[in-house]
Amino acid sequence: MTNIRKSHPLMKIVNNAFIDLPTPSNISSWWNFGSLLGICLILQILTGLFLAMHYTSDTTTAFSSVVHICRDVNYGWVIRYLHANGASMFFICLFIHVGRGLYYGSYMFLETWNIGVILLLTVMATAFMGYVLPWGQMSFWGATVITNLLSAIPYIGTNLVEWVWGGFSVDKATLTRFFAFHFILPFIIAALATVHLLFLHETGSNNPTGISSDMDKIPFHPYYTIKDILGALFMILALLTLVLFSPDLLGDPDNYTPANPLNTPPHIKPEWYFLFAYAILRSIPNKLGGVLALAASILILILMPKLHTSKQRSMMFRPLSQCLFWVLVADLITLTWIGGQPVEHPFIIIGQLASILYFLIILVLMPITSIIENDLLKW
């Protein structure tokens, strides 16, 4: 008799994706973050569902409903902080996952990579809209500033902003639609993630060496299921430590003040995971230029396969490219720090230099370095 997991139409799909999946025997812990992102998404959907049961998307009651969740709902504060800090864990895993893809040349799987970039943009949009929902000062002003960027688009800009707002300012209509979008997008993300996985399983996983591992595959279960569970335990431990010891560490104190359109906070800034892009936006004095640079900072990922000039796929045996990669990581950390600083000397010039360096490394230095490495190896 054939095993049910190999014959049942539904079980067969699960089996081919998570049990009998042939996996390279040498993939490292950097390959754990895909499964961690799946766990983060499930956690966010579940905690978000319970929050939505008690939240009201009306400007007069939104802030109070969040306070009610924290004070009166059984373990509401745990659910709320799991959701807020779960988003931070989500982005930590996302950045590492993308970084791994860049380092080991995983972007050569074009379909998987392009769906991944779409996923990144969708998750960023979802997180931004979620940040608006508690209707604190930073929620309101963050929404106002970021949606206002659309007005930089020539000719249709102003109409576009008012269309997004549903009025002449960020108000009840904006909050209601942001709540609706914030609720539906995670399910779209789940669907996209399934497509992402589908494309990945067409080609099989990459591995640290960047060369074909067809002759050296092992089943996903039990080897990588155990490995993924260990990674998940570490992530959950980190998340619970954050939630139970310092839940407001990554938040903004201004968001504990109800939204007031008549009072602008001294420093408007988004959540920490958007600060690198925010720093690039602010480093250009021109509004349209800043918006284009902001978009380019993420969309540049789509160009990665075209910018790959090395004869080797992975950076494992390319020390010059490795140095550049870690300079890029340091540059992104610098941009994240700058994004949270006030717009004054010396932060302005540091931000501008870091922004130039970001694009310079990706568009110029990495391709040239790869060509030099090819020549050194006489390829």
Swiss-Prot record:
Belongs to the cytochrome b family. The keyword Ligase does not apply. The chain crosses the membrane at residues 33-53, 77-98, 113-133, 178-198, 226-246, 288-308, 320-340, 347-367. The gene is MT-CYB. It holds the Pfam family Cytochrome_B. The keyword Transmembrane applies. A ubiquinone binds at residue 201. Binds 2 heme b groups non-covalently. It comes from Phacochoerus aethiopicus. It is found in: Mitochondrion inner membrane. InterPro entries: Cyt_b/b6_C, Cyt_b/b6_C_sf, Cyt_b/b6_N, Cytb/b6-like_sf, Cytochrome_b, Cytochrome_b_C_euk/bac, Cytochrome_b_N_euk/bac, Di-haem_cyt_TM. One of its GO terms (biological process) is mitochondrial electron transport, ubiquinol to cytochrome c. GO terms for molecular function: metal ion binding; ubiquinol-cytochrome-c reductase activity. SUPFAM superfamilies: a domain/subunit of cytochrome bc1 complex (Ubiquinol-cytochrome c reductase), Transmembrane di-heme cytochromes. Heme 1 (or BL or b562) is low-potential and absorbs at about 562 nm, and heme 2 (or BH or b566) is high-potential and absorbs at about 566 nm. Heme b b562 binds at residues 83, 182. This is Cytochrome b.
